[in-house]
Design a protein with these regions (language model features):
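Solvent-exposed loop/turn segments at secondary-structure junctions
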Residues: 218-220, 240-243
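Active-site-adjacent "subsite" loops/lids of carbohydrate-active enzymes
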Residues: 177, 242-257
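Conserved radical SAM core fold
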Residues: 182-187, 241-247
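Secreted/periplasmic carbohydrate-active enzymes, especially glycoside hydrolases
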Residues: 1-234, 257
Length: 257
């Protein structure tokens, strides 16, 4: 239930931007300039621990991403998820389609816009593909076309593995060099800006970095796309910061020691 609501009457609750402040897990109320509002029901879905705001960065509020409004045909493609599998000289490309895709045609083109594979199922093969490398990317384009809709998505083909000695990309060891970054700029603050994004990646390239950490939240889709284009690895963080003093049993077996 990942939903946020933008309201105009100063009301704050668990679903608004900015969100209402949770004092503790038993608190069923949030506050705004007009008074106290009750929050209905499901208090158990919120953590009982108190959030300690000790950020070492300015935590902007509001909408940080570009907002797009677009129209769709009645029968349309909602989304596609691409997975690549290494299999000898061939690489299998599978696409999971969400939406109406009973008559879908799948086509993969290379960076020269030449067709390298096609089919009417979500599983197609590319022989001797160009691999996506760190610092030297190569992106194919998958086009999914139906009678009423068309969806295009760029993707790279690479194999990621690791052991107790190194991280490997396409079976080659990679030494990570980079930074923990933030999505802001002194002039405009937090809003997404394509020119600033490209400037940041050019600076990363200039200093010979090959990765960055998204401290402390997932970054905009536009930035992740640029990382693909620049051959940059990304350590993608979850949106959690300032959640201190959680006991060990909170994560149980999911913890990585």
């Amino acid at each position: 239930n990942n939903r946020l609501t933008v309201v105009i009457d100063n009301r704050l609750d668990y679903h608004t931007l900015p969100s209402g402040r949770i004092v503790n897990g038993n608190d069923l109320f949030v506050y705004d300039q007009l008074g106290k509002y009750a929050v209905s029901g499901d208090k158990d879905r919120f953590p009982k621990e108190k959030q300690i705001i000790n950020h070492d960065f300015y935590n902007y509020t509001g909408i940080h991403r570009s907002v797009l409004i677009y129209s769709l045909p009645e029968k349309h493609i909602d989304d596609i998820v691409i997975r690549t599998v290494v299999n000898g000289d061939y690489h299998a490309v599978s696409a999971e389609l969400k939406g109406d895709g009973t008559d879908a045609v799948y086509t993969v083109t290379d960076e020269n816009d030449e067709i390298v594979s096609s089919g009417r199922t979500g599983g197609i093969y590319i022989k001797d593909p160009h691999l996506w490398q760190v610092g030297k990317s190569y992106l194919y384009t998958l086009t999914v076309r139906t009678a009423t809709d068309c969806y295009r998505e760029k993707f790279g083909i690479r194999k990621i593995s690791f052991d107790d000695r190194s991280l490997y990309v396409n079976d080659e060891p990679v030494y990570l060099k980079g930074f923990g970054m933030h999505e802001d700029f002194p002039v405009i603050g937090k809003g997404n800006n394509s020119a600033v994004n490209i400037r940041d990646f050019e600076l990363l390239k200039w200093i010979n970095a090959n990765c960055f950490r998204t401290s402390h939240y997932p970054y905009a889709e536009e930035i992740m796309d640029l990382a693909d284009e620049y051959g940059m690895l990304v350590v993608d963080e979850v949106p959690a910061v300032g959640c201190n003093n959680w006991p060990d049993y909170t994560y149980g077996k999911d913890r990585l020691d």
